[in-house]
Amino acid sequence: AIAEIVTEALRLEETDEKHSNYRLITPVFTEIGSKDYGISAGYGEIHFTIRSWHQTDMEAATNDFMNEVQRIADEHRLRLESEIVAVFASNQNNEDVVKAITDSAKQLGLDMTERSEPFPWGEDFGLFTQRIPGAMFGLGSGKNTPALHNPDYDYPDELTPTGVNLFYQI
């Protein structure tokens, strides 16, 4: 059943970041049975991260996926327990705030790269931008720096003055 659930997650994904229905359903943890050979697993657990650009799409992706998970559990006569552990609300940048950030960066002579699509990772910051105007930006640490949240990422302290100056300018 767990293999079917993972397959269903892949089927429900829309991985094209430019697509209006962009959604990722990524397995992040799996545990099945125990190391007792010759018997079927009596327990399984699987965790997913679900991502999309907008909160309503996130809720729809979650509902679509959970309906399919329940269907698979029913087909295999399994008892399903589900829990939403962590929600990272989608971040919606406010155009006026984005302009203030870009104007400030230009005034400071900073190089800027504006992505055509947002980063696909979620942050708690989205909870703020759902209630008050805001925008999320990053300070680049170079192409040879490991990606943020990678185990080998080490924040380059020399970025701190740039960030402080930019926030002060904004």
What are these regions (language model features)?
Residues 112-170:
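Zn-dependent metallopeptidase/amidohydrolase metal-coordination segment
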Residues 74, 106, 130-133:
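Hydrophobic alpha-helix feature that most strongly marks membrane-spanning transmembrane helices
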